[in-house]
Amino acid sequence: MTNKGYFWVVASLVLASAAQVLMKSGMLALPSISMTHWPSLSTLMAGWPVVAVLVGIICYGLSMVCWFMVLRYLPLSRAYPLISLSYAVVYLAAVFLPWLNEPMSLRKNLGVLIILLGVWLVSRDAQATK
């Protein structure tokens, strides 16, 4: 039963991370909106940026469905820390995907390493107490 839980954790993690990347990609390509000038609805709804944002929202919804399955199969104290792995996945995607092209820095890398270390420590503790 635990393996099913980890499958659903990975599915939730992948979908939530994909949602972030899709929504960011779509929002970068949409025209700017200011309080004084609103683009027409046809301008906002045209093309792939809106599709990327909508697919990202769908990915979030599917991620939540996967999370419900995680809650069925894993203890919350073991499952919830694993979701923080999405921070590392999204950071790496933002750095390595050419259209996002976000800068890598030592400080951010250390932050991601601390997150990974924390997940490892919590997971190890959960396994040791079993």
Swiss-Prot record:
It holds the Pfam family EamA. One of its GO terms (cellular component) is plasma membrane. It is found in: Cell inner membrane. Residues 28-49, 101-102 are periplasmic. SUPFAM superfamilies: Multidrug resistance efflux transporter EmrE. Pathway: Bacterial outer membrane biogenesis; lipopolysaccharide biosynthesis. The keyword Membrane applies. One of its GO terms (biological process) is lipid A biosynthetic process. Residues 55-124 form the EamA domain. One of its GO terms (molecular function) is carbohydrate derivative transmembrane transporter activity. Coiled coil: none annotated. It is a multi-pass membrane protein. Residues 1-6, 71-79, 124-130 are cytoplasmic. The chain crosses the membrane at residues 7-27, 50-70, 80-100, 103-123. Keywords: Cell inner membrane, Cell membrane, Lipid A biosynthesis, Lipid biosynthesis, Lipid metabolism, Lipopolysaccharide biosynthesis, Membrane, Transmembrane, Transmembrane helix, Transport. Translocates 4-amino-4-deoxy-L-arabinose-phosphoundecaprenol (alpha-L-Ara4N-phosphoundecaprenol) from the cytoplasmic to the periplasmic side of the inner membrane. Belongs to the ArnF family. Heterodimer of ArnE and ArnF. This is Probable 4-amino-4-deoxy-L-arabinose-phosphoundecaprenol flippase subunit ArnF. The gene is arnF.
